[in-house]
């Protein structure tokens, strides 16, 4: 619950998230519901970290993960990773995941956007066939384990984050997570 006026936004906002594992189709479904009593801004996402290779010791990076994103455009960031408000073409840049590429293939390129984000930390403007429809936004595959993740969303954008600022924190089973040891796909408005 977010009270009317909290963080400067109008309305009492109630948010409900449901996480559901579907064993029949081997899927994790995340559903969001929000209600408010005044017109306000709501832009919910999730920041789940994934490493499809598993948590071997040491934790492998996601550099070998193969990513595709159904987007012709992305939103550039400034030197402190804040979106500039521009929308730029991915074509001809290391931001282009319209065809499969490994994360590590171009992540250390001297392309200004990758330097600003210390890797990928950008919102991609999805090629939607219909506003609000549930569509495939991205895929991610680990070639060693064979694990494949498909990301579907009703939102207009998806943020790709490659764990650039992970600093070796300890997770489950004593695994540590250094930079680039996880990947996020954050469905969102932009």
What are these language model-derived features?
Residues 1-190:
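An exposed, glycine/acidic-rich loop-and-rim segment of catalytic or binding clefts
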């Amino acid at each position: 619950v977010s009270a009317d006026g909290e963080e400067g936004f109008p309305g009492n906002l109630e948010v409900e998230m449901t996480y559901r594992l579907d064993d029949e189709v081997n899927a994790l479904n995340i559903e969001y519901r929000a209600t408010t009593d005044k017109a306000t801004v709501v832009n919910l996402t999730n920041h789940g970290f994934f490493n499809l290779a598993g948590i071997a010791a040491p934790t492998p990076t996601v550099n070998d993960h193969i990513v595709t994103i159904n987007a012709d455009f992305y939103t550039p960031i400034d030197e402190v990773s804040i979106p500039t408000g521009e929308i730029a073409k991915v074509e001809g840049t290391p931001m282009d995941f319209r065809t499969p590429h490994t994360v590590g293939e171009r992540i250390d390129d001297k392309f200004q956007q990758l330097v600003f984000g210390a890797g990928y930390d950008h919102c991609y403007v999805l090629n939607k066939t219909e506003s609000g429809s549930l569509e495939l936004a991205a895929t991610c595959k680990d070639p060693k384990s064979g694990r494949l993740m498909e990301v579907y969303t009703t939102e207009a954008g998806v943020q790709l984050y490659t764990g650039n600022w992970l600093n070796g924190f300890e997770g489950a089973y004593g695994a540590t997570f250094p930079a680039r040891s996880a990947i996020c796909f954050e469905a969102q408005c932009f």
